[in-house]
Design a protein with these regions (language model features):
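Residue-level recognition of single "structural anchor" positions
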Residues: 1-225
Length: 225
């Protein structure tokens, strides 16, 4: 992906983070007093182009400022020129996007979701109820009508459906950080170049103009050798 997805002209990019864990959840890790950086919560940052559905960049790390900057630097390498970018309300994006993409003249906004407090009757696995969203322009002149993270959030669901290790209640979670990273790399490459998107009826790579055919699994494996 790094060889083929770079300096692309894009129009609208959406970014989000997907939670997972390696070995054990962060709360369990804290209870055991472990300081092993290769276990615990693992966040996958994803940037998707709204129209081609191409995954432009991804990053596996913690939900920290350092990893957010590492992710936005990858997005900067994958793109060129001005475009609109929308993220969720994670505060680290405000500096990271401007630092990595400000020179390209991007129009940056955040979609901040507002949640209601969980009633006592709900279980520990029940998601908080979203009661609304707030569109917050951060940099440049983003079009309010285009401020959305719907497409990347739909893609997050596809990720969870495609990889059992990312489902919330599972015994198939990753046991090693390297294995999760390798699985994500394979998934994103397959998604971009091999998997026909149901809406587009071609692969995202074909729609984005970086491939002229649907890749077979064999071709994908040869390209990574």
């Amino acid at each position: 992906m790094e060889e083929r997805i770079h300096s692309l002209r894009v129009k609208d990019v959406q970014c989000d983070e997907l939670w997972g864990y390696v070995g054990m959840k962060e709360k369990t890790k804290a209870k055991k007093g472990s300081d092993d950086a290769t276990i615990g919560d693992a966040w996958t940052f994803v940037a998707i182009e709204r129209y081609s559905k191409l995954v432009l960049a991804w990053h596996l790390g913690r939900r920290t400022e350092r990893d957010t900057v590492a992710f936005t630097e990858k997005l900067a390498a994958a793109t060129q020129g001005s475009f609109q970018v929308t993220t969720d309300g994670f505060a680290a994006y405000r500096d990271a996007v401007v630092l990595s993409l400000g020179a390209q003249g991007v129009d940056f906004a955040q979609l901040v979701k507002l949640y209601a407090a969980n009633p006592e009757s709900e279980t520990r696995y029940s998601p908080a109820e979203c009661i609304g969203c707030k569109k917050v322009p951060v940099f440049g002149s983003p079009d309010p009508k285009q401020i959305s993270t719907s497409h990347v959030e739909t893609h997050n669901l596809s990720m969870r459906m495609s990889m059992r290790r990312l489902t919330r209640l599972t015994n198939a979670f990753s046991k090693k950080w390297e294995k999760l990273y390798a699985m994500l790399a394979l998934y994103f490459a397959h998604y971009n170049f091999c998997r026909v998107h149901q809406t587009l009826r071609v692969t995202p790579a074909i729609e984005a103009g970086i491939s002229d055919h649907i890749w077979e699994i064999k071709e994908l494996l040869v390209a990574t050798a």
